[in-house]
């Protein structure tokens, strides 16, 4: 309990799943702490930022990745940023769990073929939450 969780999801490409991201983050926050709550902000702007702003985002996100206890990523929507975050997490040996809806995407072979990552397909939120309970060692 009280794990620091880095939640990753496609911000610029996954707008249709912002509500899902919000629900996942809220669920995790019941017992643990999500460092990246902004990913589930249903009111966030996805406009392109300045290079300076993007540099600040990079510095903050990589600091959070180094600080976290575990990475949970929703990868239904392909994202260069999430892919980078996953590689960074692997570099720092953070336990990393990838979720995706099999009916909505074909997950990259670069992720599926990497034995480092724990990968789960899911059908609905309840399936996803059950896996999160196991990952976070909750008494389900």
Describe each region flagged by the PLM:
Residues 1-140:
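Conserved catalytic or regulatory cores that recognize and/or transform ribose-phosphate-containing ligands
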């Amino acid at each position: 309990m009280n794990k620091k969780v880095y939640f990753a999801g496609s911000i610029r490409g996954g707008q249709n799943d912002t509500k899902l991201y919000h629900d996942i983050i809220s669920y995790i926050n019941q017992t643990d702490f999500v460092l990246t709550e902004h990913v589930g902000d249903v009111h966030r702007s996805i406009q392109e930022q300045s290079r300076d702003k993007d540099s600040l985002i990079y510095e903050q996100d990589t600091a959070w990745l180094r600080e976290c206890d575990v990475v949970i990523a929703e990868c239904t929507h392909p994202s260069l940023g999430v892919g980078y975050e996953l590689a960074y997490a692997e570099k720092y040996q953070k336990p990393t769990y990838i979720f995706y809806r099999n009916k909505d995407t074909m997950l990259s072979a670069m992720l599926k073929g990497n034995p480092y990552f724990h990968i789960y397909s899911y059908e609905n939120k309840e399936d996803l939450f059950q896996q999160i309970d196991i990952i976070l060692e909750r008494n389900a």
